[in-house]
Amino acid sequence: MISVQSLCKQSINQTMKHISKIVLIAIVFLSSCFTRSDAQVESPKFQKKLQRLLRHNVKEVSIAEVKQFETVIYLDAREKVEYNVSHVENSVWVGYDDFDIQSVEKLDKSKTIIIYCSVGYRSEKVTKKLEKVGFKTVYNLYGGIFEWYNQGLPIVNNDGRETDKIHAYNEKWSQWVKGRKEGDEVF
């Protein structure tokens, strides 16, 4: 015959198993809500600046990680004047102040999309907007076009020709663009 004490132990054990499963599910869910990036830039000072500047509330991708993707759609979240100086080849300008979600509604939501701006601040906000409307594989380019340029990757002008000119936003932000010759940065 089963004792009352034995039944209580079984009931408590089953309840604890259910609670453990619920807690585990909650931990997994909550950890996915708070995206933490391991993305890095080459300059320790720039890295420190980005850690403070960005909210890190979207998926971030480093320049090294970008190279792992076979096909990518690049969206430029800078202002048109910045884009006109230079941009990542084949990128689509979507802007920031004038960003309109309708400008990207025809994009395939299952494709990998990387959004960039100068350093990642504006593109982080645009990335969040795309996530909210159902884009699944969208990433903020950590360090933006400045880090792209710093690591020697090509940028092109509006004629599609490779250029060394880069819009450095303003003199203060130009400090994060390295390896340039006098006159390569534009404000």
Predicted regions and their residues:
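Structural scaffold elements adjacent to functional motifs in cytosolic proteins
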Residues: 74-76
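Bacterial Sec-dependent N-terminal signal peptides
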Residues: 1-45
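Short, surface-exposed ligand- or partner-binding patches at beta-edge/loop junctions that are enriched
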Residues: 116
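Rhodanese-like catalytic fold shared by cysteine-dependent sulfurtransferases
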Residues: 17, 33-63, 69-70, 80-111, ...
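Conserved G/P- and acidic residue-centered "switch" motifs that form tight phosphate/ATP-binding loops
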Residues: 120
